A protein has these predicted regions:
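N-terminal targeting or regulatory segments adjacent to alpha/beta-hydrolase or S9 domains
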Residues: 2-5, 11-64
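N-terminal cap/lid segment of alpha/beta-hydrolase-fold proteins
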Residues: 46-91
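Short substrate-entry loop that stabilizes the transition state in hydrolases
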Residues: 89-94, 99-141, 209-210
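Alpha/beta-hydrolase active-site loop
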Residues: 148-168
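Alpha/beta-hydrolase fold nucleophile elbow
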Residues: 170-181
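Hydrolase active-site cap/lid region
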Residues: 189-243
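Short beta-strand/loop motif that positions the catalytic acidic residue
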Residues: 262, 268-270, 274
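C-terminal catalytic histidine-bearing segment of alpha/beta-hydrolase fold enzymes
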Residues: 276, 283-327
């Protein structure tokens, strides 16, 4: 039986050499290599996670408790927002959802801010939820190198999954993932790396393969992304060539190439007026899922934006119902 969450400051002493939030050292940037993003490489790594350590007890929700917790990912202390339903867990433990947030400037990110209403909807429905900061965000250790050309964030969410599986109140066979925008990219990757994940919901996800991301994603990057992080894309193309010149390499990095390995269905949501993520990403993934013989639900909201503001209640209700049916 896994120990319950216990407040501790021990890790603060052993892991005190953290880079400031959002920092990128020359050494970390130099060591980043797009080949580390291959699905095959990710499957060779271990993701042991750790016990969840309470850092702060927050005001409770309507029918659940809230905590800032931390867990370990490659020796880094990663903070996360955890919710736990009130009452006695069902036989085998509560179902759980790892909650993957979209891009927020790491230096302004706070564990307890953003996505509050989203996470609350799943928490009220009887799920344990865990929203990871990702490394280099807020008070979490490590360096924020982005999701697309460095593997750190993927590693962090997979260690979040393992940390939930270690917790005695969670049913390790009933864990799913929710992801928004960049978090949708992480969700799809995590699910093809770990087929024990039973279901995924992706809102406005960056879910194109690398050919699509490099060729068909023409939005202007946020000014808050450091130039040196943006240059990881140019570094990758300079070293490995374009997707047209080296298709085998880039297919190996794309979760879309491994959809047959998914351990459960996907539910996809997007608005047609999304100014950040092209509708094309959503449509192609839905088509690829059907071609792979995998179950997928696709919801397109006419005129809605990146956050599905006009249809928030509907999208949340559909997402909660999906997880209730699949976990």
């Amino acid at each position: 039986m896994t120990r319950p969450l216990v407040p501790s400051l021990a890790l603060l002493g052993t892991l005190s050499l953290a880079a400031p939030a959002g920092a990128q050292s020359a050494a970390a940037l130099a060591s980043a290599d797009a080949a580390q993003m291959s699905i095959a490489a990710a499957r060779q790594k271990s993701y042991p996670g750790s016990a969840l350590t309470v850092r702060q007890t927050l005001a409770p929700g309507m029918n659940y408790r809230r905590f800032v917790v931390s867990y370990l990912s490659e020796g880094l202390r990663i903070n996360a927002l955890l919710t736990v339903p009130n009452g006695t867990p069902p036989k085998g433990g509560w179902p759980a959802i790892v909650f993957n947030h979209g891009y927020i400037p790491p230096q302004v990110y706070r564990t307890t801010e953003r996505y509050v209403a989203y996470q609350d909807a799943f928490a009220r429905a009887g799920f344990v939820t865990l929203k990871s900061d990702y490394r280099g965000h807020g008070g979490s250790q490590g360096e924020a190198l982005g999701a697309y050309f460095a593997p750190g964030y993927t590693t962090d969410v997979l260690n979040a999954v393992s940390s939930l599986r270690r917790d005695g109140r969670v049913n390790g066979d009933r864990i799913g993932m929710w992801g928004h925008s960049m978090g949708g990219f992480l969700t799809l990757r995590a699910m093809v790396i770990d087929p024990r994940l039973k279901a995924g919901v992706i809102w406005a996800g960056v879910v194109g393969d690398y050919s699509t991301i490099l060729n068909d994603w023409n939005n202007v990057p946020p000014a808050s992304i450091p130039r040196r992080v943006l240059e990881l894309r140019q570094k990758a193309v300079a070293k490995y060539g374009t997707p047209e010149a080296n298709p085998t390499f880039w297919r190996g990095l794309s979760a879309n190439s491994y959809l047959k390995d998914l351990g459960g269905p996907l539910q996809l949501h997007i608005g047609t007026a999304d100014a950040d993520v092209p509708l094309l990403f959503h449509e192609r993934l839905a088509s690829q899922m059907r071609a792979a013989g995998k179950p997928v639900q696709s919801y397109v909201y006419p005129g809605d934006n990146h956050d599905l503001t006009r249809n928030l209640g509907t999208a949340l209700a559909r997402s909660v119902a999906f997880f209730k049916a699949r976990l």
